[in-house]
Every structure is written in C-alpha cells, then in structure tokens.
C-alpha cells in the first residue's frame, strides 16, 4: 500500500510522459492506472522481473522492453505530442525519440485494452517473491 501511495504522490506532480501514459490507459480501459496496474503481476510498476503472470502482465513486459530500446531521451519523463482520432491514439511527435516513447505507450495502452479479459484483481499487489522464473529476453 505504501508503494501505491508513493506512486500516486509522485504522479500528482508529473506533467511528462507518465501522466500522458496514465491518460491513454484510462481512456482505453476505463481503469484507473495507478490503482489497477502500478503493482500488477511481475512486470507492471517500478521493477519488472520474472515471467508474466497473464496477458495483462505481458503488456507491461513488452512496454518495459520498448522503453529499454529508447536510448536518446528519457521515456518516463519526456513529454510528447499525441491526439485522439475516432477513439485511436495518434502519435504526432516530430522528434523521433519522443515519437518512439509515444508509440511504446500507445502499444501498451492498446495491449491493456485487448487483454482486459485476462485482468484479475488477485494480481494487484502480486508478491514479487513469487516472480522467480527467469525473465524472457526482450
């Protein structure tokens, strides 16, 4: 619970990418991202480790891998430009690095939407001590 509180406080002051990502997830899934995904499974939240527990957790794994490929800017903090067109996210950033961040977030938000049926409340606050199988390579 303390981790959730810290994350909520941190996100209140964030005007960069994490807030944008939160808005994408909320619009795509209807779920409050901080409460629903920040501590979900083995790969969602601050430290992803181990095999994904389900499709939702796999979305986080893939998102983490996507962020690892972004090397010339800061994926968690750099703002980017995007819009909504007919219910779809359109990344409009001209800066290639920021566009890549937007595409990572867009793919994850769509993945959460597409895997909403795999989402299980029991995987919130999933014990990281249960994430013992080796992590897949990106």
Swiss-Prot record:
GO terms for molecular function: calcium ion binding; calcium-dependent phospholipase A2 activity; phospholipid binding; toxin activity. Expressed by the venom gland. Keywords: Disulfide bond, Myotoxin, Secreted, Signal, Toxin. Its main location: secreted. GO terms for cellular component: extracellular region. The keyword NADP does not apply. Gene3D superfamilies: Phospholipase A2 domain (1.20.90.10). GO terms for biological process: arachidonate secretion; lipid catabolic process; negative regulation of T cell proliferation; phospholipid metabolic process. Disulfide bonds join 42-131, 44-60, 59-111, 65-138, 66-104, 73-97, 91-102. It is found in: Secreted. It holds the Pfam family Phospholip_A2_1. Residues 1-16 form the signal peptide. Snake venom phospholipase A2 (PLA2) that exhibits potent myotoxic activity causing inflammatory cell infiltration, severe myoedema, myonecrosis and myolysis in the gastrocnemius muscles of BALB/c mice. Belongs to the phospholipase A2 family. Group II subfamily. N49 sub-subfamily. Homodimer; non-covalently linked. PANTHER family: PHOSPHOLIPASE A2 FAMILY MEMBER, PHOSPHOLIPASE A2, MEMBRANE ASSOCIATED. Negative results: does not possess enzymatic, hemolytic and hemorrhagic activities. Fails to induce platelet aggregation by itself, and does not inhibit ADP-induced platelet aggregation. This is Basic phospholipase A2 homolog TM-N49. The lineage of its organism: Eukaryota, Metazoa, Chordata, Craniata, Vertebrata.
């Amino acid at each position: 619970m303390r981790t959730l509180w810290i994350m909520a406080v941190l996100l209140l002051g964030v005007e960069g990418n994490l807030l944008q990502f939160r808005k994408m997830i909320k619009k795509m899934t209807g779920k409050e991202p901080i409460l629903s995904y920040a501590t979900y499974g083995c790969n969602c939240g601050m430290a992803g480790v181990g095999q994904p527990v389900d499709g939702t957790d796999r979305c986080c794994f893939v998102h983490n891998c996507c962020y690892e490929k972004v090397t010339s800017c800061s994926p968690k903090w750099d703002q980017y430009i995007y819009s909504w067109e007919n219910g779809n996210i359109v990344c409009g950033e001209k800066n290639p690095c920021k566009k890549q961040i937007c595409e990572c977030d867009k793919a994850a938000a769509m993945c959460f939407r597409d895997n909403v049926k795999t989402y299980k409340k029991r995987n919130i606050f999933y014990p990281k001590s249960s994430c013992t199988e080796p992590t897949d390579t990106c």
